């Protein structure tokens, strides 16, 4: 039997040349969960995808995969542009969030912060052009409203805008830091409008609104 375009003769050997494409393809979901239960994020879609499953993976290591993230200005700065799409805060996080020097830009937060309560480690992350979609009536901070027994390292906020109308704790980076370590962090600019009504204690700060308990540290 002769070999045709669709057939091969029995008992004969044929040489076939073909290429295998081993290049990684970003999942449609924008994130991937590895065999250890850790989460790898590649874009805006991936961040919102993580938001939906974060309660199931509170202790996970979450990594912004810098190699695959856009560099819009060609200046070496990798950016995930959220386009001011509303972000509901991660309710609680106790793992490791590795920002890898990536900037999350145009982040519009519904309330509290990027994360509501953090007991984990957040590092090497920049938040740029942060806003709150509604007037603030409870404790809040751009990165986290509450950070306890945690580590915040090398994190920056470049521009935050908020209006506070109740006596609360508010910080440009962290609202309340309790028994946590904040190292190498900064808030470069922000506008906080105070239009308060009602009774209660208020604490506001450019970096941290309230910093308390004996082992809480702010370094550099």
Give residue spans per PLM region.
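Surface-exposed repetitive/solenoidal architectures
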Residues: 11, 23-220
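Extracytoplasmic cysteine-anchoring/structural motifs
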Residues: 1-26
């Amino acid at each position: 039997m002769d070999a045709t375009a669709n057939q091969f003769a029995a008992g004969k050997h044929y040489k076939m040349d073909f290429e295998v494409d081993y290049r990684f393809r970003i999942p449609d979901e924008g994130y991937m969960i590895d065999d250890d239960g850790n989460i790898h994020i590649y874009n805006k879609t991936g961040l919102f995808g993580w938001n939906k499953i974060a309660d199931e993976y509170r202790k996970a290591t979450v990594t912004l995969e810098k190699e695959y993230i856009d560099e819009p200005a060609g200046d070496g700065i990798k950016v995930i542009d959220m386009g001011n799409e509303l972000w509901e805060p991660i309710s609680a996080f106790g793992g490791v969030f590795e920002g890898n020097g990536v900037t999350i830009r145009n982040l519009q937060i519904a309330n509290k912060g990027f994360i509501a309560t953090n007991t984990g480690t957040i590092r090497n992350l920049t938040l740029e052009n942060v806003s709150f979609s509604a007037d603030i009536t409870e404790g809040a901070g751009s990165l986290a409203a509450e950070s306890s027994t945690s580590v915040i390292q090398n994190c920056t906020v470049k521009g935050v805008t908020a209006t506070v109308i109740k006596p609360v704790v508010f910080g440009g980076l962290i609202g309340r830091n309790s028994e946590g370590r904040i190292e190498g962090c900064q808030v470069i600019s922000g506008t906080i409008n105070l239009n308060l009504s009602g009774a209660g204690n208020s604490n506001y700060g450019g970096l941290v609104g309230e910093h308390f308990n004996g082992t809480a540290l702010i370094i550099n």
